[in-house]
Each structure stands twice: as C-alpha cells, then as structure tokens.
Amino acid sequence: MNKAVFGSFTILCLLSISSIPVLIHVVRADGGTVFIRADGSIDPQTAPIYTADNITYTLTGNITADDDGIVIERDNTVLNGAGYTVMGNGSGNGIDLINRNNVTIKNTNIENFDYGAYLENSSNKTTSGNNVANNSGGIRLDYSVNNSVSGNNITANYRHGIRLDYSINNSVGGNNLTANGGDGVYLYYSVNNSVSRNNVVNNGGGIGLDYSVNNSVSGNNLTANYGDGITLGSSSNNSVSGNNITANNAYGVHIDSSSNSSVSGNNIKANNWNGIRLDSSSNSSVSGNNITANNVYGVGLYSSSNSSISGNNIANNGYGVGLDFGSNDNNISANNITANNGHGVGLFSSSSNSIFHNNLVNNNVQVYSTSDSANIWDCDYPSGGNYWSDYNGMDLKTGPYQNKTGSDGIGDTPYIIDSSNKDNFPLMGTFSDFNAPSKYHVQTICNSTISDFQFNGTAISLNAAGKNGTTGFCRISLPAAPINGTFTVSVNGTDVPYTLLPESNNTQSYLYFTYHHSTQEATIPEFPSSIILPLFLTATLLTAMIYKKRPTRTT
C-alpha cells in the first residue's frame, strides 16, 4: 500500500515540474504590459526578464500583452529578447520608448501591435536583429535623433516597415523588409538620414521620402515592390546612389515636385513604367546609371527643368529619354541611348534643351519631336554634337564651316531632325568621356571601341577595338593644364602622324590620328573578328613637377 502511494506521489511531482516552463513563458500583468522603471526595477516582478546589473535586461520567456508590450523608462539600457516573443492583440506598441537616450533593443520577436517598436523624442538608440512582423506598422521614430535601425527582419506589417517622422541623423541599414503594405522605409519631414544596404522586396512601395531634406538612399536592393522603387516627393537635396532597382510595378525612381536631387550609379532594370521619372521637378542630376529594359521610358521628364541627364547607359527600354509638357532648359549629354524599342529621344512641347555628346545607336526611331519643340543638338565646333548610327555623311573637311581640307571627327553636313531641329556637327564616331587627374576630363571621338583608359600624369594610354582590316580614327580632346608641350602619338610602339586641330588653345588641345585594325594585333581570343590596339599618347611636360625645371622665357 505504501509503495503504491509513493509511486503516485512521484508521478505527480514529475508532472508538476514539467509544467513550470509553461507557466513562465507567457506572462500577463496589468494588462500584460511590462515596465523597466527609471530606477532599474522590473514591473511586475514576475515578468520573464532578468537583469544582474540594471543595464542589460534579458527575456527569459514570451510576453503576451493587451496594450503596450514592454515600456522602457530608463536610459542607458539594453533589452535582449534572446529570441523570445512579445505578442500583442493589435493595439499599443510592442516596445515603447519616449524621451529615452542610449537604449538598445535586440534579438526580439515582436508581433501583432499597432507598432512593433515606437520611439518618440529618443536618441542614440540601436534596434538590431529583431523580427518585427504582422503589426499595423513595423518600427516608427518620431522626433528622434542619432538612432540606428539595422539588421532587422521586418515583414508583413500592414503599413510601412520602418517610418521616420520629423527625425534627424538616423541610420537605417541592412534590414530585410518584405511584404509590408506600405513602403519598406518611409521618411516624412526628416533630415540628414541614411537609408542603406536594405533588402526591400514585395512591399507596397520601396523607399519613400516626403518633405525631406539632405537624406542619402544608397546600396539598397529594391525589387518587385507594388509601387515605385524609390519616391522623392516635395523633397530637396537628397541623394539616390548605388541601388539595385528592378522589377517594381511602377517607376524605378520617381521624383515629384522636388529639387536638387541626385540619382547616380544605380542599376535600374525591368520596372513596369519608367526607369526614372521627374515630375514638376528642377535642378536635379541623373548620372552614371545603368537603365535597361524598363517598359516605358528609361528616363522621363514631365514639366521639369534645369536638370542634367548625363553619362547614363539607356538601352532596350520602351523608349530612351522623353521630355514632355514644358520640360525646358535641361541638359542631356554623354549618354549611350541604344536599341530602345521606340524613339531614342522624344520631345513633346519642350524646348531650349541642350542635347549633345550622346551616342544614339540603333533606336527604332532616333528622335521624335513635336512641332512646338525647338532644341539645341550640338555644342558648337570643335566640341560637336551627337553620334548617330544612321548618319550617312562624310568627313573630308574640317573647321567651323567644314570647308577646309582634312578630317576632324565631325561630319561635313548636318544631321537633320526636322525644320526646327538639327545637329550641325554630328560626330563620326562614338563619344567617350574619361576622368583624368585633378578633375580634368579627356574626351574621345572614335570609330573603335575604347577601353582600358589610363592616364599617369605624363601619358595617356587606351585600347581601341575595331573590325578586322578596317581603318580606325580617334580624336582626343585634352585639357592643356596637366598636359602641355610637344605630343607624340604611338600605335603599337610605332609613332604615327597626327593633326593638331587649329582650334586648339591654351585650355584645350584637339588631336586627330588614324590607324589600321590588323589581325596581327589580335590579343583577345573571345573577339576573333576584332583587335586591340594599344594607343599611347605621350606629352613632353615642361613643368617643375616633372622635370624640376621650367622652359626659358623669351623677352
């Protein structure tokens, strides 16, 4: 009889012990809200949070709350969720910080609140390594300064993934933002913030800025968002650089009613509307972007002015560059506008735009211009106009009137677009612009493909690839400041004659020379029909820096 009683008692004890973890993993007290008080205490004391030093607070179980989850009233603290979950019922904030400084929130799962984490008037706070999902909004900062939001997974929130309102000098970086109903990241009336290296996929929109100034959006991946990849609305002096912006359902980058925006070095591909769109915007720069396979325009301007579109690769889009509804006084230069399905450049009721040094190659229609559009298509002589792949003119003459014997890389007759538009000095080869030391530029017009440009301060070298057995030419424009003196042009180690155009002056030198593409010089096996010719352009420099002496002055 006693043995039977002992056995029953043992079983009951084991069952009781096994139930203890279940009791401490889910805690409700005072509506479920847990407070870290200003004096370092935890309220209620039964909450599954442990601290040994009143600095680092570590969850030891899950928390379920009817309103706010955890309210931190103490500065200089660390909340380590240790992988546990703070679960709400659709109201309140998962983690709530108001008027706090130097707080870290990490490794916490936060679900089913109004906001997963909410900061107001807070500074020097780090939010990292958290999973914030299925809330109305993910993480929100109001009137907050010098905070970092990094390395979080923010998914399936009804509104924005991360939102900053009236906030300054914050960093939002390295987060994974997916399937949020609003923008992955949204800034409103915010200044000097950095949004970088985030993966922003399948959200209502990618990254949005409204009424915001001096922010940087860089190095993000923005893919398959239902709206725009990046939107700047009524904002100024913002930078968008080095982002991968692909397959978004609207525009890749949309700049609306904004000024002094910079969009540079981005890969903008296969977006449903324009790659880049400027609406009612001014004084913006779009440069060095790779803009391909977008369904409508690569770059489209609508009622926008005084902006620069330069150095972009704009290829295989529905259309290349479009200016519409009074987009005047813009500069479109040094772009490769290639193989677009419609027109390469379209102008609709837009005038006084400068369009030169572009390579327009194999577009279905090179230019479409309405009768009320009159624009400038060249930069005078000898700088020249654009390269047109369908230009059939010759280059037997030189000079500003193309009436002197000799070649100069400029076509002898204009390229006619319509009665109001013509390129007076069409280029005979593609245009390239290379950076040289001290912010100088070296520009080439060449019927070969240029690569491996190098300038060491005393010599310029470049490779030119062309069809086997043909004659190549190159016209090089050099700044006189770093290179002045007597020139020597060498092709494959052999000096060749060149022409120094009479228009050369004390600021710019123009050299023209020819060469033959020869199979004996083939050095790249994957291009058997092409050759690579090293072209060395050397100048004897008469400067103290190089030779430690100056030429004798004549009196």
Positions of predicted regions on the chain:
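Solvent-exposed beta-hairpin/edge-strand motifs
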Residues: 77-80, 477-495
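Surface-exposed beta-strand/loop patches in extracellular or lumenal glycoproteins
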Residues: 67-73, 368-369, 465-485
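Functionally critical loop-and-helix segments that line ligand-binding/catalytic clefts
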Residues: 19-56, 84-85, 124-125, 129, ...
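Thr-biased low-complexity repeat/linker tracts and other Thr-enriched repetitive architectures
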Residues: 124, 128-351
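A cross-kingdom C-terminal cell-surface attachment/processing module
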Residues: 529-549
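N-terminal extracellular ligand-recognition/capping segment immediately after the signal peptide
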Residues: 39-43, 53-77, 83-87, 372, ...
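Short, charged juxtamembrane terminal tails flanking transmembrane helices
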Residues: 550-555
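Extracellular beta-strand-rich solenoid/capping regions of secreted or surface-exposed proteins
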Residues: 51, 64-79, 87-104, 112-122
